[in-house]
């Protein structure tokens, strides 16, 4: 009969593919369960209020039109819905595909069963497939995996969350309209069951059997599979566990499958008492906590509570006398095997000959160890016992008492067993690889000895007092030939023949009285020894390794092992070399990967890589978690070193008087530093002792693990310091900004110095790590803060700064800002608010409008540079850019609302435009014309002024940041600054040349050079924020004249001061000149340059008209508004770095030259 799994056996390949797919689906569900977007949980009140109207459960399907019309009625809800779609469609689609594949899985399995029944596979029926060993295994696995899939989904992704995701996918995806979409079936299968994995949650009635019956499955198939599982040892595991008391462990995998599959036929659990008694007697006579898949544990006492027959059958097992007997038995077993294993692990005990002579004994010890570990770990696990269930608590308490349970001792047994297994496997692999060469070597040696003896008896080779004996000579030659004729490939015949040869050599010694000659005896003894070695060597079989692999299975502890983390970490802290022992435990745990990967591998499925990566990644993450205690302990010592170095140890001067040497010696503190440094290097040594290890398919390099661990701890501490250090009280007078920055600067400096100090002792590049991680923390926080301003937000899993191995912690917001960088930015904006302060450009300083006291100055940015570095300033700059964009967008919507929709305003503007046209002329009766327009539009300017001043304020801050970045770059990185400057000038020259002559080259759209160089230039402060285009704009009617009117409406609130320029006239009605100028300049920069030209022409006309009126009325002084307008033009030209002739085109140059002299 054709091999069931042969590639040309379509029937076998089809079911193998289904099972392979099942394992891959479970891995995908487990992977996705860690990425459920928080909004779908609707846990906190803020999410409920914000998203409650756009995230629906299945009640949506009762009347989709009603819900959609509710959305359409509110434009802001539509906007939010669209934003939510853009941010979540990718992850929701991924979840939907996983749900779809679960449904497809059961559809495929049902189709396969139908094909079998209809004879699609020639000569194959359900019965014949179940007769084949592989077929029987695969059919049982196919149904079992479907059950596991459903249970895992319900455990990891709550029913309500699934419903919300499915509805969201239905609403947002175009796929719903396609004819082949099976959305309805998927929704029916995965609708909420009412089950909750929260502790203390009640189990819904008829759960999980009603859930398992949502898609009907062939009943004959279910009952035949249950029949096979009840009667057969489908995986032939009993051969690996010959002792009857290990029977339930041997059948544990099969028991887990039966447990799951029984829910497909719940009548057995309810009423078939005889069947349930048979099942319990075979599979659960001494155990009731089982692992069903990759460490998911179930307590049968709880799970079978609602089922009469199952509960009755299990009562014998759960009888307190039986519980006591089992717990006591495993207590004595674990005591016995612990001593045995420790004996085996003694240095030098496990040698090759000991191993070869004691294989059965060693394997028995391993079996006992693993069975005891399994029973104790499962039956004492917290996850398997509901603390609210009195009976379960009572059983568990009895186990803990009777087994004298001590988690440290159990963990030690696990460590020793893993180490013992590891050594045994390594030795066996070594022996198997050398098996043939050694066997041939022993054969050659034995044969040569016999040839030499034959020569001795021939009389040719003289040996003391050995007489010539032709018979013996011929006999030894024959034996030599017989030894040479032994064939390695026919091990059975060779073994039998070798035994006969040993007997013959013993007999020849007795019959011919050869004992009298010691040398002949020695030759015979040596040959017998070589023949014995040949028998031993030929008995080294791979079956031993397979048995060790089977009995060493630790997949049941995939999740339970986490409860031992604290014990592992404590033992590492006390003795860092413990890491080498843990390596064997991690490798033992890695063997659990065989379970889900076996079928995927057999099917040559492309899922092999992703599933291996998922489980290997999970295990490596766990290894990292355990070993993180080393960096943690190092940092604890490091903090003590920092404290000693900064507070206790005095800096030794370059010149030192001899009599002061004792004062500077400070032997106590220095000894303490040396001791702590030694402890750090011991920890480093500990982790580096763990060799490079392949965990699943991921190579774990201890040096990399150490570095990642140090980075993780550094990130955790620095992120916390930044979060805690930058929380401000907005009511504090004066602001806490500078003191907090100084304090944080000292903390960061401490971290930095300690990192420099430690790098040589742990063999890492301290400065490189420091810069990479601090920049990552700051950039990530800036990204999170900027998400506030983005419609399509960057999720953590999309962020280039966030990492799974070295995660940047997130902290709950303490105010409207999400992160420390937002709080810092808003505090700076608060204290430099143009309504409260006056900015003096020549001094780069802000003063309080009322008290005239200095509020802050450019020193603030030097302090930020010292504390947060270039990354901090650059991040602040980026955040200000986003804020400016938001402010400009708000401004545009306000412009549309106030100016373009108010009829009175429009009429006023029309009248003014007709009065001022043409712009080259002089407006007759100008003061009246302008005053009338200002008066009619007075109410719109307050909101306008606020927006313009905010933009101007942020532009001043950006200028200050650029100056600070540029000066620090020129000091600290002269060559970089010069190179960037040159490259920038060269690029600009090339671009200008292209515009003069289009045949010259120009960077194409797909060329990222300009984007990349811009990032560098902004980080080095080589840019002018005033030239930046922040938003794209359309043509706006009346735009130049509105801005002109706004400006002349503000001029009466200001006055000219010879020393300070334009300052606020009344503190009660504050207007700050620099933010006003820069705000207007920035706003105009966003539009076509002709708007700016019109705006400047209007100001020029205003100055000329006012001057004309003033001279005609023979007023001796220049009007204040004209001075203000002239100063605006002057500042405009200065800030934009334009030539003066731009202003002189609208105002005669002699007025510019002379106006200050008449003030």
UniProtKB/Swiss-Prot annotation:
One Pfam assignment: Strumpellin
GO biological process: cholesterol homeostasis; endosomal transport; endosome fission; exocytosis; lysosome organization; meiotic spindle assembly; oocyte maturation; phagocytosis
Organism: Mus musculus (Mouse)
GO MF term list: identical protein binding
Main location: cytoplasm
Stated name of the protein: WASH complex subunit 5
Species lineage: Eukaryota, Metazoa, Chordata, Craniata, Vertebrata
Superkingdom: Eukaryota
Function, in words: Acts as a component of the WASH core complex that functions as a nucleation-promoting factor (NPF) at the surface of endosomes, where it recruits and activates the Arp2/3 complex to induce actin polymerization, playing a key role in the fission of tubules that serve as transport intermediates during endosome sorting. May be involved in axonal outgrowth. Involved in cellular localization of ADRB2. Involved in cellular trafficking of BLOC-1 complex cargos such as ATP7A and VAMP7. Involved in cytokinesis and following polar body extrusion during oocyte meiotic maturation.
Cystine residue pairs: none
UniProt KW Transmembrane keyword: no
GO CC list: cytoplasm; cytosol; early endosome membrane; endoplasmic reticulum; endosome; neuronal cell body; WASH complex
Keyword tags: Cytoplasm, Endoplasmic reticulum, Endosome, Protein transport, Transport
Protein family per UniProt: Belongs to the strumpellin family.
Complex formation: Component of the WASH core complex also described as WASH regulatory complex (SHRC) composed of WASH (WASHC1, WASH2P or WASH3P), WASHC2 (WASHC2A or WASHC2C), WASHC3, WASHC4 and WASHC5. The WASH core complex associates via WASHC2 with the F-actin-capping protein dimer (formed by CAPZA1, CAPZA2 or CAPZA3 and CAPZB) in a transient or substoichiometric manner which was initially described as WASH complex. Interacts with VCP, PI4K2A.
Annotated localization: Cytoplasm, Cytosol; Endoplasmic reticulum; Early endosome
């Amino acid at each position: 009969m054709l091999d069931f799994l042969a590639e040309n056996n379509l029937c076998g390949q089809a079911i193998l593919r289904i099972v392979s797919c099942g394992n891959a689906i479970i891995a995908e569900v487990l992977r996705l369960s860690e990425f459920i977007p928080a909004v779908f949980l609707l846990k906190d009140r803020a999410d409920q209020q914000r998203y409650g109207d756009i995230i629906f459960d299945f009640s949506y399907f009762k009347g989709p039109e009603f819900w959609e019309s509710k959305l359409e009625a509110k434009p802001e809800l539509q906007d939010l819905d669209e934003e939510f779609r853009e941010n979540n469609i990718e992850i929701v689609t991924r979840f939907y595909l996983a749900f779809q594949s679960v449904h497809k899985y059961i559809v495929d399995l049902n189709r396969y069963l139908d094909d079998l029944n209809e004879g699609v596979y020639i000569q194959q029926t359900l019965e014949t497939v179940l007769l084949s060993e592989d077929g029987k295994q695969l059919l049982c696995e196919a149904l079992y995996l479907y059950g596991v899939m459903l249970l895992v989904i319900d455990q990891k992704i709550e029913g309500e969350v699934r419903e919300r995701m499915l509805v969201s996918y239905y609403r947002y995806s175009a796929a719903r309209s396609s004819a082949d979409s099976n959305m309805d079936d998927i929704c029916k299968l995965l609708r909420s069951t009412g089950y909750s994995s929260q502790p203390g949650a009640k189990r819904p009635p008829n759960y999980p059997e009603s859930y398992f019956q949502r898609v009907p499955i062939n009943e004959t198939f279910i009952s035949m599979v249950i029949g096979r599982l009840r009667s057969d040892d489908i995986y032939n595991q009993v051969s690996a566990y010959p002792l009857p008391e290990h029977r339930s462990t041997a059948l544990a995998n099969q028991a887990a499958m039966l447990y799951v599959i029984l829910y497909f036929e719940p009548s057995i659990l309810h009423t078939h008492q005889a069947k349930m008694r048979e099942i319990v007697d075979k599979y659960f006579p001494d155990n009731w906590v089982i692992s069903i898949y990759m460490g998911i544990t179930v307590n049968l006492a709880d799970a079978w509570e609602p089922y009469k027959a199952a509960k009755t059958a299990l009562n014998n097992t759960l009888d307190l006398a039986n519980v006591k007997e089992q717990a006591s038995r495993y207590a004595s077993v674990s005591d016995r095997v612990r001593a045995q294993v420790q004996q085996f692990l003694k240095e030098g005990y496990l040698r090759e000959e000991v191993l070869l002579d004691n294989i059965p004994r060693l394997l028995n010890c391993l079996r006992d160890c693993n069975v005891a570990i399994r029973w104790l770990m499962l039956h004492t696990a917290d996850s398997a016992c509901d603390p609210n269930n009195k009976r379960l608590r009572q059983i568990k308490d009895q186990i803990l008492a009777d087994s004298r349970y001590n988690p440290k001792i159990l963990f030690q047994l696990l460590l020793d067993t893993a180490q013992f297994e590891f050594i045994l496997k390594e030795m066996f692999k070594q022996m198997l690889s050398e098996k043939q060469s050694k066997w041939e070597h022993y054969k050659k040696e034995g044969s040569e000895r016999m040839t030499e003896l034959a020569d001795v008896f021939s009389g040719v080779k003289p040996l003391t007092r050995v007489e010539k004996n032709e018979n013996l000579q011929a006999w030894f030659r024959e034996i030599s030939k017989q030894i040479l004729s032994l064939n390695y490939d026919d091990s059975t015949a060779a073994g039998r023949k070798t035994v006969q040869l040993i007997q013959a050599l013993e007999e020849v010694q007795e019959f011919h009285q050869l004992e009298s000659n010691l040398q002949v005896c020695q030759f015979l003894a040596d040959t017998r020894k070589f023949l014995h070695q040949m028998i031993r060597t030929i008995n080294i079989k791979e079956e031993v390794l397979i048995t060790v692999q089977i009995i060493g299975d630790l997949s049941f502890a995939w999740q339970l092992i986490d409860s031992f983390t604290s014990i592992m970490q404590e033992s590492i802290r006390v003795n860092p070399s413990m890491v080498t022992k843990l390596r064997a435990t991690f490798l033992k745990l890695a063997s659990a990967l065989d379970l889900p990967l076996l079928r995927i591998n057999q099917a040559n499925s492309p899922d092999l890589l992703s599933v291996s990566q998922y489980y290997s990644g999970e295990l490596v993450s766990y290894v990292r978690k355990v070993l993180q205690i080393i960096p943690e302990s190092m940092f604890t010592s490091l903090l003590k070193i920092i404290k000693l170095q900064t507070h206790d140890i005095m800096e030794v001067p370059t010149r030192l008087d001899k009599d002061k040497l004792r004062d500077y010696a400070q032997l106590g503190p220095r000894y303490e530093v040396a001791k702590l440094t030694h402890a750090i290097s011991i920890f480093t040594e500990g982790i580096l002792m763990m060799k490079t290890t392949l965990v699943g398919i991921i190579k774990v390099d201890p040096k990399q693990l150490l570095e990642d661990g140090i980075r993780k701890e550094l990130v955790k501490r620095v992120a916390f310091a930044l979060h805690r250090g930058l929380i401000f009280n907005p009511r504090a007078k004066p602001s806490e900004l500078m003191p907090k920055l100084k304090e944080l600067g000292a903390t960061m400096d401490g971290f930095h110095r300690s990192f420099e100090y430690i790098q040589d002792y742990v063999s890492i590049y301290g400065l490189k790590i420091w810069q990479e991680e601090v920049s990552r923390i700051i950039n990530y926080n800036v990204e999170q803060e900027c998400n506030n301003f983005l419609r399509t937000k960057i999720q953590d899993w999309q962020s280039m700064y966030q990492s799974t191995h070295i995660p940047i912690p997130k902290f709950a917001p303490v105010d409207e800002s999400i992160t420390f960088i937002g709080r810092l930015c808003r505090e700076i904006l608060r204290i430099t608010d143009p309504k409260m302060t006056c900015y003096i450009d020549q001094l780069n300083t802000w003063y309080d409008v009322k008290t005239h006291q200095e509020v802050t100055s450019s020193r603030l940015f030097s302090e930020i540079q010292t504390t947060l570095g270039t990354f901090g300033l650059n991040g602040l700059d980026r955040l200000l850019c986003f804020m400016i964009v938001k402010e400009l967008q708000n401004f545009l919507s306000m412009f549309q609302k106030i100016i373009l929709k108010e009829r009175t305003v429009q009429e006023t503007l029309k009248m003014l435009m007709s009065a001022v046209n043409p712009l080259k002329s002089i407006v007759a009766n100008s003061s009246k014309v302008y005053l009338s327009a200002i008066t009619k539009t007075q109410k719109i300017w307050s909101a306008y002024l606020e927006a313009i001043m905010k933009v101007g304020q942020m532009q001043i801050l950006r200028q200050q940041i650029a100056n600070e970045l540029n000066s620090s770059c020129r000091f600290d990185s002269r060559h970089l600054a010069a190179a960037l400057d040159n490259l920038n000038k060269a690029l600009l020259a090339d671009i200008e040349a292209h515009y003069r002559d289009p045949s010259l080259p120009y960077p194409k759209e797909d060329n990222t050079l300009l984007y990349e160089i811009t990032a560098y230039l902004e980080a080095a402060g080589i840019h002018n924020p005033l030239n930046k285009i922040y938003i794209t704009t359309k043509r706006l009617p009346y735009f130049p004249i509105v801005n002109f009117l706004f400006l002349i409406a503000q001029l009466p609130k200001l006055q000219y001061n010879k020393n300070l320029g334009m300052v606020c006239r009344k503190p009660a009605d504050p207007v700050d000149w620099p933010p006003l100028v820069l705000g207007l300049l920035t706003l105009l920069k966003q539009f076509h340059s002709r708007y700016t030209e019109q705006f400047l022409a209007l100001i020029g006309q205003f100055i000329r008209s006012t001057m004309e009126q003033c001279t005609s009325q023979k007023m001796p002084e220049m009007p204040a508004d004209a001075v203000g307008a002239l100063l605006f033009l002057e500042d405009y030209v200065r800030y934009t770095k334009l030539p003066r002739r731009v202003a002189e085109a609208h105002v005669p140059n002699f007025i510019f030259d002379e106006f200050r002299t008449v003030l």
